[in-house]
A protein has these predicted regions:
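Glycine-aromatic micro-motifs
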Residues: 2-140
Length: 140
């Protein structure tokens, strides 16, 4: 599921650099940081992870990355598909889907891959700022 020529990734949750998680360590080996960006969408607090869903009337703040070595992209993004629950086996529920999205940065608009949440966000708190790191800092 790769669109030839798209080697960028937009992340808004635990893959962001502010988390210093194992998942972030993984992507930092294969992807280089391009900068902060935003996409049209809404961000929800699911308790143990954030859920981004497409929406034209709001923005999600995150980080834009580009693969360091293009021939490794399919393998690297496949590993992230597994991490995000895109690739499932029988009787598992797919939590996220990978899709292309317009990313707005300070100087340009580009296309990147994003992991959108596929489940219900009904009754879950909306992260008004669209920025998970800011939201978690304010909750402290």
């Amino acid at each position: 599921m790769n669109n030839p020529g798209v080697y960028k990734l937009f992340v808004y949750g635990s893959l962001r650099s502010g988390f210093k998680s194992h998942a972030y360590e993984y992507i930092s080996r294969f992807f280089s940081f391009d900068g902060i960006g935003k996409v049209n969408g809404k961000l929800f607090d699911m308790g143990t992870y954030p859920a981004g869903v497409p929406a034209a009337d709001a923005f999600i703040v995150g980080e834009l990355y580009t693969i360091k070595n293009e021939p490794e992209f399919s393998w690297a993004i496949g590993q992230l598909d597994d991490y995000e629950g895109v690739s499932v086996v029988t009787d598992e529920i797919q939590l996220f889907r990978r899709d292309l999205v317009d990313v707005f940065t300070e100087n340009a608009t580009t296309i990147a891959w994003i992991f959108w949440y596929t489940g219900s966000v009904e009754g879950k708190p909306l992260i008004e700022s669209g920025d998970l790191i800011q939201y978690l800092q304010q909750k402290k």
